[in-house]
């Protein structure tokens, strides 16, 4: 990651794109307080990523491609576990658990082991758990990998609902059609941000019809490095 600079607004859906090895995962780990940058300045949810990494962790949500769920725990047990980690109180957890299961249509699956859920259901549950504590920002690392297009669209509806509640969404994806769903996107090449704007403006700037065409133009000049 080489001297990247950007700002993300509250409630914005910000796409963080780049090929494997571009530096996306490394940058995200720095923003989440999991890796320490060697230089520069940065704030996440209002907290300094150098001096207040633990505060950063408490005020964010995170979901990886593997969904961050415990397969051998029941649906409600996963919710309770992660809510407890984020310091939520027992009564609040119980109330919000019932609301969440009803909203997702999971009420009948409350006692089902997560490993028995269809992949798309696991995905929706993992995202809902990652924002259960109403974080200021949620980081989604390749969240829709391995699921069908219809399920991906349903997942993005959940993302829009979260953004409407004021939760900032920071998402990495390999699917260029998903880039169109973001308010703004950045594209990393060899550790640097080579483009940052709305999808419409980037397509206009590069004189192309799709975000995939934008990405291909930038990626042609990449020198691949380990992420």
Regions found by a protein language model. Name each.
Residues 134:
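Conserved catalytic motifs of ABC-family nucleotide-binding domains
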Residues 196-197:
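ABC ATPase "signature
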Residues 80, 84, 91-109:
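Conserved ABC ATPase "signature" region
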Residues 40-51, 55-56:
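Conserved ABC transporter NBD signature motif
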Residues 138-142:
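Catalytic Walker B motif of ABC-type/P-loop ATPase nucleotide-binding domains
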